[in-house]
Amino acid sequence: MKWLAIILVVALLALQYRLWMGEGSIASVVSLNREIAKQKEENARLRERNRLLAAEVDALKQGKDAIEERARNDMGMIKEGETFFMIVDETDKDTKKNKK
């Protein structure tokens, strides 16, 4: 009976070690669940970015309005006969003077 108790205690310790420290342990499962959650967030962010880029590509394929808007905003282009006015904020001037 004494040997049976010792064997059972050793088996219990071996199983507990595997549960807490071994492969597939509670700690590794928790860590994997965290990684899965992070990856799901990243996938959702990238999916939204892809959706926006696809919408932009479709808009550029559809007509001149999107191309014109892009040229105006990104490249600073203006139409023939238009006048471009740049409004400078006074606080920007003061900030630049104080840095010198």
From Swiss-Prot:
Record keyword Aminoacyl-tRNA synthetase present: no
Gene Ontology biological process: FtsZ-dependent cytokinesis
Cytoplasmic side stretches: 1-3
Topology term for the membrane: Single-pass type II membrane protein
Location in or out of the cell: Cell inner membrane
Keywords from the UniProt entry: Cell cycle, Cell division, Cell inner membrane, Cell membrane, Coiled coil, Membrane, Transmembrane, Transmembrane helix
GO-annotated cellular components: cell division site; cell septum; plasma membrane
Coiled coil stretches, renumbered: 26-73
InterPro entries in the cross-refs: Cell_div_FtsB (IPR023081), FtsL/DivIC (IPR007060)
Periplasmic side stretches: 22-100
Pfam families listed in its UniProt record: DivIC
Membrane-spanning parts: 4-21
NCBIfam families found in the cross-reference section: PRK00888.1 (NF002058)
Quaternary context: Part of a complex composed of FtsB, FtsL and FtsQ.
Family matches, as PANTHER family: CELL DIVISION PROTEIN FTSB
Function of the protein: Essential cell division protein. May link together the upstream cell division proteins, which are predominantly cytoplasmic, with the downstream cell division proteins, which are predominantly periplasmic.
Family: Belongs to the FtsB family.
HAMAP family per the UniProt record, alphabetical: FtsB (MF_00599)
Name of the protein this chain belongs to: Cell division protein FtsB
Organism: Saccharophagus degradans (strain 2-40 / ATCC 43961 / DSM 17024)
